[in-house]
Swiss-Prot record:
Component of the mitochondrial ribosome large subunit (39S) which comprises a 16S rRNA and about 50 distinct proteins. Pfam families: Ribosomal_L23. InterPro entries: Nucleotide-bd_a/b_plait_sf, Ribosomal_uL23-like, Ribosomal_uL23/eL15/eS24_sf. One of its GO terms (biological process) is mitochondrial translation. Residues 120-143 have a biased composition (Basic and acidic residues). One of its GO terms (molecular function) is structural constituent of ribosome. It is found in: Mitochondrion. Belongs to the universal ribosomal protein uL23 family. The gene is mRpL23. GO terms for cellular component: mitochondrial large ribosomal subunit. It comes from Anopheles gambiae (African malaria mosquito). This is Large ribosomal subunit protein uL23m.
Length: 151
């Protein structure tokens, strides 16, 4: 499970060891609508259902009822210049079912305040574009004259 080698036991040495697996688990927003107690994760290809369940229960204290996994094939792309084909890496997805009493809602990363700020920034950008276009239109009849040489 892990590629780390631990030192050989010698009498008198402290034996406090931390086991760090080479696994990773990433929370993914599902493409299709899922029930509220089903959570989708992208995980490393080496993880099994049992590994995913233990990972969530032991490290994060998340109660798990069922785990289903699937492997999504990576897409293929043709190079535009040389014409050879490359394949993206396959990804493994784990669908974790929580108890019926537990519900998971995907966190709102961009709250309404941030959305409002983004809209304000877009509006100010549009105003700047409009003013620049008006400035360019004003100097159309004087080609070759620098912009600072205006009234």
């Amino acid at each position: 499970m892990s590629s780390r080698w631990y030192p050989i036991y010698q009498r008198g040495n402290p034996q406090l060891r931390v086991f760090l697996p080479n696994f990773w688990l990433k929370l993914v927003r599902p493409a299709n609508e899922q029930p509220p107690n089903v959570v989708q994760f992208a995980c490393s290809m080496e993880m099994t259902r049992h590994d995913v369940k233990n990972y969530l229960e032991k490290i994060y204290n998340v109660p798990v009822v069922n785990v289903r996994t699937r492997i999504a094939l990576g897409g293929t792309k043709r190079d535009l210049v040389l014409g050879y084909i490359t394949k993206e890496e396959d990804t493994k997805y784990a669908y974790v079912t929580l108890p019926r009493t537990k519900q998971f809602t995907f966190p709102d990363i961009f709250p309404t305040d941030a959305k409002q700020k983004i809209e304000d920034d877009k509006k100010s950008l549009e105003d700047a574009k409009k003013n620049h276009k008006k400035f360019l239109d004003k100097n159309k009849d004087r080609p070759g004259t620098p912009g600072w040489f205006s009234i």
